[in-house]
């Protein structure tokens, strides 16, 4: 079956060839399609021809399986014990490939990918919309060799005029609604895909408040125009980044010629930061003397992680420290009228709040 055999044939051909001189470029069309041009690779594996030759060698009139069947029935000689070896058929490299052709023929591959999940519960529709919208804006980003990619430059300002809605975000250390709330989740997803690829990240900011759903010290916050996420392509070939949004997740994948970087991480110890404060908010609709915690307070803390990037030979290319300092979360206590200042909360857990993840 060609569909089943093709991945194995392409993988074998890739192992046999020398990709040291291979580089690719990407060309985007207005209709969203991507064309690929390859340099340093003159041939592509022809899976269909290879499968046909293999089929003939195994099941043809003189094939090994046919001979074995005839021998079992008392006719002919026993087939040779050596395995059947068929060279991979090759053809000339087209001047231009579609993205899918380049992927199927092993000219390019997805060499780093990262996925984060988000809530689809009641009240999150605006946030989901913003995540999907900014993902579309970032999708099919191309970074040339030696080039830089910027989240803010690529997406532009996140405003209502450009289709963004008001949703939960972290603003000045507190959870609030802001146009474009939620896009930081996409920034975090991109950052981790680039982090795992071993590509340089000259600019990255952590969120003001800690978000436990992300790897320790590996969140990324963006805010127009001050907070940006920037990464660089230090390879000899162009990199295409695809950002896709599913029903409850977003994925960033880097495509191109795999540089073969090996990435490891040293995670430091958490250190104590600033202590949290408590704020009382009077709600006249509550019964006198009652109180409840709206937002549970959390002390600030900080952490540093170190990424070590090595080449295929095991040589250290660079070590990168990413430090993150998270502010405390103010505890918000909602009280009814005439509640004494020293009264502790008496009812209700803190409400779930979702920030700019």
Show the residue positions of the predicted features.
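Short, surface-exposed ligand-recognition loops at beta-strand->loop->(often short) alpha-helix junctions
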Residues: 1-3
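Well-ordered beta-sheet/strand-loop patches within structured domains
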Residues: 6-7, 11-20, 24-31, 35, ...
């Amino acid at each position: 079956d060609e569909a089943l055999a093709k991945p194995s044939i392409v993988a074998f051909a890739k192992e046999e060839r020398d990709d040291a001189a291979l580089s690719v470029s990407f060309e985007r069309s207005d209709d969203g399609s991507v064309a690929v041009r390859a340099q340093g690779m003159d041939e592509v594996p022809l899976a269909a021809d290879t499968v046909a030759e293999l089929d003939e060698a195994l099941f043809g009139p003189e094939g090994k399986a046919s001979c074995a069947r005839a021998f079992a029935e008392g006719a002919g000689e026993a087939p040779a014990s050596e395995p059947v070896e068929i060279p991979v058929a090759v053809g000339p490299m087209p001047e231009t490939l579609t993205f899918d052709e380049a992927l199927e023929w092993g000219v390019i591959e997805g060499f780093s990918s990262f996925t984060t999940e988000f809530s689809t519960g009641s009240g999150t529709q605006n946030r989901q919309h913003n995540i999907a919208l900014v993902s579309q804006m970032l999708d099919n980003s191309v970074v040339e060799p030696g080039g830089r990619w910027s989240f803010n430059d690529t997406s532009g300002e996140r405003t209502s005029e450009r289709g963004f809605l008001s949703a939960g975000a972290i603003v000045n250390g507190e959870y609030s609604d802001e146009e474009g709330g939620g896009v930081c989740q996409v920034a975090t997803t991109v950052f981790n895909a680039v982090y795992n690829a071993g590509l340089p990240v000259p600019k990255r900011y952590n969120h003001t408040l800690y978000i436990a759903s992300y790897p320790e010290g590996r969140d990324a916050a963006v805010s127009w125009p001050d907070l940006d996420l920037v990464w660089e392509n230090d390879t000899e070939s162009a990199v295409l980044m695809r950002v896709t949004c599913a029903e409850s997740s977003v994925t960033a994948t880097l495509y191109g010629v795999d540089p073969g970087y090996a990435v490891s991480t040293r995670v430091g110890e958490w250190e104590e930061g600033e202590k949290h404060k408590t704020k009382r908010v009077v709600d006249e609709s509550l019964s006198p003397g009652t109180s409840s915690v709206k937002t549970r307070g959390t002390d600030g803390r900080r952490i540093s992680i170190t990424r070590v990037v090595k080449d295929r030979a095991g040589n250290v290319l660079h070590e990168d420290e990413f430090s993150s300092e998270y502010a405390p979360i103010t505890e918000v206590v909602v009280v009814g009228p005439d509640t004494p200042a020293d009264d502790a909360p008496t009812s209700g857990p803190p409400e779930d709040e979702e920030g700019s993840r």
